[in-house]
A protein has these predicted regions:
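N-terminal small-residue-enriched
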Residues: 1-336
Length: 336
């Protein structure tokens, strides 16, 4: 990374986490699960003419070193090049417009605005710490997004950071469809909440370790794959922006209004990617944005989320989130 023009600092931090859980209950269950997570966090910082720009990325999954060895060099080159290019980029002009969002950005959007509100304890108001409300409380069976929006949680996706076989209530994991064609169908449930919602436990009850009570937690919540080529999604945009890679979220207590900054963006003009944009924030409200989605790509990707806090006292958890490239309408503005 340091050989790239204008790069003044680069960091690569590889690490692994081992996790062993032994579960026994009065129903006769005896379950031992062992997992190893391998992760590498990288950041490249460029500085020139009084302007500093940084781009970071995290790669990893549940498995062996091959999960990061195959991606780390390519990702390191990409973030170094982007940080260098951002030195000459301009801040974005504030406007409400068409946005094409790449899978990395979509993964954080999914995590914050679709995943957490799908945890049934938050829907019921039983876990309100850390923006613990749910913007779709009481709306099961109602339309909350466009027919292009399909969302699921799936702890069985192998090699994702949300992959496991049984939760901390001894419930076997499975894929749970949360939203189908824009209709809210279900929440992530534990044994208690499933009775309230006339549902079944979904295998999402997890604790950070033995010292904490389990909470309903995302495993691998994603927007489902679409059938459109990404180039075609961009080509259909007359005026808009291509939003790349997650940065920092800000949400209200019900996760209704949200803003998420991205690492960088590109202007779309008459179906072509043009000028690089820096310091970009994307803002919207949940129902308006999700109803505006008119395209989902065929490039489904699961990204690593290495830190998620929930509860009081707060518990941290790692998980996967993802989706394909999506297109919708929201507001962009510059940080500065």
């Amino acid at each position: 990374m340091m050989s790239t023009p204008s790069i003044i600092k680069s960091v690569a931090n590889p690490y692994y986490v081992t996790n062993s859980k032994y579960f026994v209950n009065s129903e006769g269950s005896e379950i031992l699960q062992n997992f190893t997570d391998v992760i590498i966090e990288m950041i490249a910082t460029a500085h020139e003419s009084g302007l500093t720009q940084s781009v970071n990325i995290t790669e990893g999954g549940r498995g062996g070193l091959e999960l990061i060895q195959n991606k780390s060099q390519e990702s390191a080159k990409e973030i170094a090049n982007k940080a260098s290019e951002l030195i000459n980029a301009k801040p974005v002009k504030e406007e409400k417009t068409t946005l094409v969002m790449n899978p990395d950005f979509v993964s954080l959007l999914t995590h914050e605005i679709l995943g957490h509100p799908s945890e049934a304890d938050r829907v019921l108001g039983k876990e309100m710490a850390w923006a613990g409300g749910a913007w779709w409380k009481g709306k099961i069976g109602e339309k909350i997004g466009s027919e292009n929006l399909n969302v699921f949680d799936d702890p069985t996706i192998k090699e994702s950071l949300g992959w496991y076989y049984f939760d901390d209530e001894g419930v076997e994991t499975k894929k749970t469809n949360l939203i189908e064609n824009g209709i809210l169908k279900n929440h992530m449930q534990n044994r208690e909440t499933s009775e309230i919602f006339n549902s079944v436990p979904t295998g999402n009850m997890r604790a950070t370790n033995y010292r904490y009570m389990p909470l309903i937690r995302m495993a691998c919540t994603c927007i489902a794959n679409g059938n459109q080529n990404v180039d075609e999604i961009i080509k259909d945009v007359k005026n808009g922006y291509y939003i790349s890679n997650m940065k920092v979220p800000s949400i209200d207590m019900k996760r209704y209004n949200w803003s998420i900054s991205c690492q960088y963006a590109q202007k779309i003009e008459n179906g072509e990617l043009t000028d690089l944009q820096r310091d970009v924030i994307v803002m919207g409200n949940a129902p308006e944005f999700f109803n505006s989605i008119d395209a989902c790509g065929n490039d489904f990707t699961v990204r690593p989320i290495t830190y998620c806090g929930k509860g009081d006292p707060m518990q941290s958890m790692i998980m996967g989130n993802g989706g394909p490239t999506i297109r919708g309408t929201a507001t962009v503005k510059s940080v500065n």
